[in-house]
From Swiss-Prot:
This is Large-conductance mechanosensitive channel. PANTHER family: LARGE-CONDUCTANCE MECHANOSENSITIVE CHANNEL, MECHANOSENSITIVE CHANNEL MSCL. Keywords: Cell inner membrane, Cell membrane, Ion channel, Ion transport, Membrane, Transmembrane, Transmembrane helix, Transport. PROSITE patterns: MSCL. The gene is mscL. It comes from Paraburkholderia phymatum (strain DSM 17167 / CIP 108236 / LMG 21445 / STM815) (Burkholderia phymatum).
Length: 149
């Protein structure tokens, strides 16, 4: 088999194509989750915490250069200028994105597994009572009904 033929078989197998589709959809889905966190959840968290904007929360690690023309309270401006800063607010936002994404994926997998699960089988009829048990029951019943001596 030639290298081209082997690669063609590999690339056109169902699993590789499924993976490619999953990566593309995952990229689009990530954008949606980022928007949900940035535009819907973080503003609510900001209001709940008294108007805090987590994206601009940082600890300055270096010195701001004298020719710095940006906003010294803007993490993005400081990053652009090459100032060392520990951006914990950005990390909090990314961590929330991850938790929400993981929760949504978990719920989707759970839903898909529920759809794939086979329908519960009907309860099987109980097995017939063995003959020796039936015979013992007959003996018991006849002893109950017989007069005592």
């Amino acid at each position: 088999m030639s290298l081209v033929t082997e690669f063609k078989e590999f690339a056109l197998k169902g699993n590789v194509m499924d993976l490619a589709v999953g990566v593309i959809i995952g990229g689009a889905f990530s954008t949606i989750v980022n928007s949900v966190v940035k535009d819907l959840i973080m503003p609510v968290v900001g209001v709940a915490t008294g108007g805090l904007d987590f994206s601009n929360k940082f600890i300055l690690l270096g010195h701001i250069p004298p020719n710095f023309k940006g906003n010294p309270d803007s993490y993005k401006d400081l990053q652009t200028a090459g100032v060392a800063a520990f951006g914990y607010g950005s990390f909090i936002t990314v961590a929330i994105n991850f938790v929400i994404l993981a929760l949504i994926i978990f719920m989707m997998v759970k839903f898909i597994n529920k759809l794939r699960a086979p329908a519960p089988a009907e309860a099987a009829a109980p097995p017939p009572t063995p003959e020796d048990v039936l015979l013992l029951r007959e003996i018991r019943d006849s002893l109950k009904n017989s007069p005592r001596v």
